[in-house]
Structure formats: C-alpha cells, structure tokens
Curated annotation (Swiss-Prot):
Gene name linked to the record: rpmF
The protein's name in its UniProt record: Large ribosomal subunit protein bL32
InterPro entries the UniProt entry points to: Ribosomal_bL32, Ribosomal_bL32_bact, Ribosomal_zn-bd
GO aspect biological process, one term: translation
Any one of the GO CC terms: large ribosomal subunit
Length: 66
C-alpha cells in the first residue's frame, strides 16, 4: 500500500485545494417578474423565456386534488 514519504505541509495542502472552490452562480433579475433567475433559462415563476410564454401551468381541478 502506498504511504507518503514526507508529511505534506499545510501550505502545500492548501495550494493543492485552491482549485476546488466553487465558482459564483451568475443570476439576473427577470424583467417581467423581478425575481432572480439563471440566464438563458425559463423563468420558474411565469414560464417565460426571452419575454415569450413557453410553459403553461396546469391548473388542478377539484377531482385531481381529492
């Protein structure tokens, strides 16, 4: 089994981990609803993309709820 020959210093360990950080998420404000959303994605609030309705919400009837 492989065993390290020398102890890895805190500095070298942290330098190795410097590339593992997560990047910032780019969010924009939706012009119609004012909610935050990811760019180039459909708005989750009203189902619009590029100011066009692309997803319609299904309205549940009383039979489906019960």
């Amino acid at each position: 089994m492989a065993v390290p020959k020398k102890k890895t210093s805190k500095s070298r360990r942290n330098m190795r981990r410097s590339h593992l950080a997560l990047g910032k998420v780019n969010v924009i404000v939706d012009s119609q609803t004012g909610e935050y959303k990811l760019p180039h994605h459909v708005s989750l609030v009203d189902g619009t993309y590029n100011n066009r309705l692309v997803v319609t919400k299904k309205i549940k009837t009383e039979e489906e709820v019960a």
